[in-house]
Swiss-Prot record:
Taxonomic path: Bacteria, Pseudomonadati, Campylobacterota, Epsilonproteobacteria, Campylobacterales
Protein source organism: Campylobacter lari (strain RM2100 / D67 / ATCC BAA-1060)
Topology class, membrane: Multi-pass membrane protein
GO MF, one example: quinone binding
Function: NDH-1 shuttles electrons from NADH, via FMN and iron-sulfur (Fe-S) centers, to quinones in the respiratory chain. The immediate electron acceptor for the enzyme in this species is believed to be ubiquinone. Couples the redox reaction to proton translocation (for every two electrons transferred, four hydrogen ions are translocated across the cytoplasmic membrane), and thus conserves the redox energy in a proton gradient.
Family of the protein in this entry: Belongs to the complex I subunit 2 family.
Name assigned to this protein: NADH-quinone oxidoreductase subunit N
């Protein structure tokens, strides 16, 4: 083949994926031949993640930036590189803060899932995105079910069933895109003469189903509450943050390609408004902190969807500066939420029960822990001067700049409704009559991570400047 060249493969770009897959296979084989301690598997997994992170930090801007691999099936741009770094950092934080006894295959599946997430955000080809999406999803279903309890298995099956329906819609959407454009590459779709075709609008609506499932946007969120109640508390923090980061990048790529001529952003805006308002009202009547936080994560995902609507609008207008503002607002908001969310669930993992009443009078018994919990709660509520407040200001500025005033009103109203739900737990912690609270103690690693989460949730916006 005269046109064949090894340079077109560009294996350097795929090193993060290949490295994590190698470590996943090694850990799986080690478990088959010799039973090793849990600490060994945690250490090996962290080494795998950290070495991949170092590679990204060292080679960013030298080899990876705006380069392609495997005949343009994979791309490495600034958004993908930054998202990969965030995924690796919060994956390591999860492994360090988790004290639950996990089986050896858990860590192999965990690395396989992270590799699939990185692959998903590194491609602009719909088939590659779909394969990586399903690879990460299959690993996640299994990780949820590995706990072995009835709740864990049933929630995993419910998630699998709903996601399988979403995957079917994704395949149909890909078929529609190929039918009209004769291409499955999103870069080609951006410059397609068929961008205003109604068939592509139908494809966008079908894509929206899998997006709703993966980002847990109402009315595709029914699996989330069961998962929150069925898995280990620290793992809840992970699945509510890390898999969604990869999906957010995919949504940005797909919706930016579809938002040029069919005014697809109107449909996405309506879904975001419905999701954030409906779920905020449901969150008010919850009697369990975990379930309330499940609905809280849905509202935050809806806010992210609102930013994506803004980015779609300004991207179709060719306003590069406003588009960058939208992306910056998205990352500031989600990273601030990630730190605060990790902190909250790390504290919740110390308690056997998660009802509001079980936290009554916690301040009288553990004042420092109560104050830290209050800071994290106020952070996700968007109270100044915490990081999410600045992220939400950037979100509102971005949406205003794109002209979606109804979306701005919906974000503000949803935030006010959720504020009451957040303050409810603080009322129990600080003002309710004290009762005996059964709780464990933080080890040294968890104390360090809790402090890091506190710093990150308060000052994230300044760290990113």
């Amino acid at each position: 083949m005269s046109g064949f060249s090894l340079e077109k493969f560009n294996f350097v770009l795929l090193f993060p994926v290949l490295s994590l897959l190698f470590w996943a296979i090694v850990l799986l084989l080690l478990d088959a031949f010799k039973k090793l301690s849990r600490n060994f598997y945690i250490g090996a997994s962290i080494i795998a993640l950290f070495s991949t992170l170092c590679f990204l930090l060292i080679y960013n801007g030298f080899v990876l930036d705006n380069s392609h691999a495997f005949f343009d099936l994979f791309v490495s741009d600034n958004y993908a590189i930054f998202a990969q770094i965030v995924i690796l950092v919060f994956s390591m934080l999860y492994l360090l803060m988790d004290k639950d006894e996990q089986k050896a295959e858990f860590f192999s599946l965990f690395l396989f899932m992270i590799a699939s997430l990185i692959l998903m955000i590194s491609s602009t080809n719909l088939i590659v995105i779909f394969l990586a999406l399903e690879g990460s999803s299959l690993a996640l279903y299994t990780l949820i079910a590995l706990r072995g309890t009835h709740n864990a298995i049933s929630s995993s099956i419910k998630y699998f069933t709903l996601a399988a329906v979403g995957a079917g819609f994704f395949v149909f959407a890909c078929a529609f895109v190929y039918l009209k454009t004769k291409s499955l590459d999103l870069d080609n779709l951006l410059h397609s003469e068929y961008i205003s075709d109604p068939i592509l609008l139908c494809a966008g609506v079908m894509f929206l189903v899998i997006v709703g499932v993966k980002l847990s946007i109402a009315p595709f969120h029914f699996w989330l509450k069961d998962v929150y109640y069925g898995v280990h508390t620290n793992f809840i923090a992970f699945i509510s943050i890390v898999p969604k980061i990869a999906m957010i990048i995919v949504v940005l790529r797909i919706f930016s390609a579809l938002g040029g001529g069919v005014k697809f952003e109107y449909i996405v805006a309506l879904l975001a408004i419905f999701s954030m308002l409906a779920v905020s009202i449901v969150a008010l009547i919850q009697k369990d902190v975990k379930k309330m936080l499940a609905y809280s994560s849905i509202t935050h995902s809806s806010f992210i969807l609102a930013v994506i609507v803004s980015s779609m609008s300004v991207s179709s207008q060719g306003d590069g500066t406003s588009y960058l503002l939208s992306i910056f607002a998205l990352f500031v908001y989600w990273i601030s939420f990630a730190f605060a969310n990790y902190g909250i669930f790390l504290i919740l993992s110390l308690f056997q029960k998660s009802s509001f009443e079980s936290f009554s009078g916690l301040f009288d018994q553990r004042p420092v822990l109560s104050i830290m919990l209050a800071i994290f709660i106020l952070c996700i509520a968007g109270i100044p001067p915490f990081g999410i407040f600045w992220g939400k200001i950037l979100i509102l500025a971005s949406i205003l700049n794109s002209g979606y005033y109804a979306l701005v009103f919906a974000v503000a109203l949803s935030s006010m409704i959720m504020l009451y739900a957040y303050l409810k737990i603080l009322i129990y912690v600080f003002f309710k009559k004290a009762q005996i609270v059964e709780s464990a103690n933080l080890d040294v690693k968890q104390k360090i991570i809790l402090c890091l989460c506190l710093i990150g949730s308060v000052s994230c916006v300044f760290l990113l400047l």
